[in-house]
């Protein structure tokens, strides 16, 4: 079958160490290949499920070769591959094989119907922002990372509160004693930041949110900043303070280390089925639909 879609090569990425994921991945690969698309697998995914019929590529090779990546897993899988493919602007399609699934919005039961429709051009596209962070020690950068959801400075479970000196665009904001501080994107506002009483930011809002974790002073409240802000967090006191990036990579900090966070120049293109609604996602995932909506007749 000749492909007339804007997509020619489709990469499949699966959630690691997940029993039962081989069958849906191989079924999806066959479904896509039968429609004339070239199918490649992310290398670790291919090795884990024993796929040998398709090329196995590292993320950088996927970025250079694939036109779109279909991710079967949970939000964590999307976060990980999203960071790696962001420099290549490879669009992502998410199939939920996890628990919550805020950004993997296609049910696995519907993937063989919906994914081919999207590959044929029937989708809605949006751009999700990333954060970039670097750790400065004695005036020198020692670590750099991207974050799809959030950059989190926090204490270990066996140490006391950390004192953090926070400034925005070079202007002093406050000294905060707390268990830590979350700097989140709109995408990340429904992750750790939400559980720490932060606000929900619509994904298309141009902002980042700072959310204290269990602050000593109850007046230390979350604040939303313009997304062109540069946030600097210096470690004033505290033992065993770490910084995490999407809770998937971390590094230990020393006193006087400074974490500089700003919006990355990279964005992640995300593709959704036609009719996708962010508000429908919130209703479903946060159980807002426990009460009848205006679109539904109340039950008698």
UniProtKB/Swiss-Prot annotation:
Location in or out of the cell: Cytoplasm
The EC number(s) this enzyme carries: 2.7.1.23
Catalytic activity: NAD(+) + ATP = ADP + NADP(+) + H(+)
Active site residues according to the UniProt entry: 75 (proton acceptor)
Entry GO CC: cytoplasm
One MF term in the entry's GO annotations: NAD binding
Predominant location category: cytoplasm
Superkingdom to which the source organism belongs: Bacteria
GO BP term, pick one: NAD metabolic process
Cross-referenced InterPro entries: ATP-NAD_kinase_N, ATP-NAD_kinase_PpnK-typ_C, NAD/diacylglycerol_kinase_sf, NADK
Keywords carried by this UniProt record: ATP-binding, Cytoplasm, Kinase, NAD, NADP, Nucleotide-binding, Transferase
UniProt-annotated binding residues for NAD(+): 75-76, 149-150, 177, 179, 190-195, 214, 248
Required cofactor names: a divalent metal cation
The family this protein is said to belong to: Belongs to the NAD kinase family.
Known function: Involved in the regulation of the intracellular balance of NAD and NADP, and is a key enzyme in the biosynthesis of NADP. Catalyzes specifically the phosphorylation on 2'-hydroxyl of the adenosine moiety of NAD to yield NADP.
Protein name: NAD kinase
Species whose genome carries this gene: Paraburkholderia xenovorans (strain LB400)
């Amino acid at each position: 079958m000749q492909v007339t879609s804007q997509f020619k090569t489709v990469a499949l990425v699966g959630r690691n160490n997940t029993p039962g994921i081989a069958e849906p991945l191989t079924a999806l690969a066959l479904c896509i290949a039968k429609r004339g698309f070239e199918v490649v697998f992310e290398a670790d995914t291919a090795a884990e499920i024993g796929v040998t019929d398709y090329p196995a590529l590292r993320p950088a090779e996927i970025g250079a070769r694939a036109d779109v990546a279909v991710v079967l897993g949970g939000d964590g899988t999307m976060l990980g591959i999203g960071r790696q493919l962001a420099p290549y602007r490879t669009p992502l399609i998410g199939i939920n094989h996890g628990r919550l699934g805020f950004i993997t919005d296609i049910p696995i039961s519907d993937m063989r119907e919906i994914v081919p429709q999207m590959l044929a051009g029937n989708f809605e596209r949006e751009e999700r922002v990333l954060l970039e962070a670097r750790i400065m020690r004695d005036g020198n950068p020692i670590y750099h990372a991207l974050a799809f959801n959030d950059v989190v400075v926090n204490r270990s479970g066996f140490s006391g509160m950390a004192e953090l000196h926070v400034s925005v665009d070079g202007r002093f904001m406050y000294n905060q004693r707390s268990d830590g501080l979350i700097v989140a994107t709109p995408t990340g506002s429904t992750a750790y930041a939400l559980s720490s009483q932060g606000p929900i930011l619509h994904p298309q809002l141009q902002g980042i949110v700072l959310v204290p974790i269990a602050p000593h002073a109850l007046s230390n409240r979350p604040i939303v900043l313009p997304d062109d802000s540069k946030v600097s967090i210096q470690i004033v006191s505290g033992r065993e303070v770490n910084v995490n990036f999407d809770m998937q990579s971390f590094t230990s900090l020393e006193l006087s280390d400074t974490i500089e966070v700003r919006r990355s120049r990279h964005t992640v293109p995300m593709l959704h089925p036609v009719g996708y609604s962010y508000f429908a996602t919130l209703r479903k995932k946060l159980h807002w639909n426990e009460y009848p909506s205006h679109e539904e007749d109340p039950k008698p």
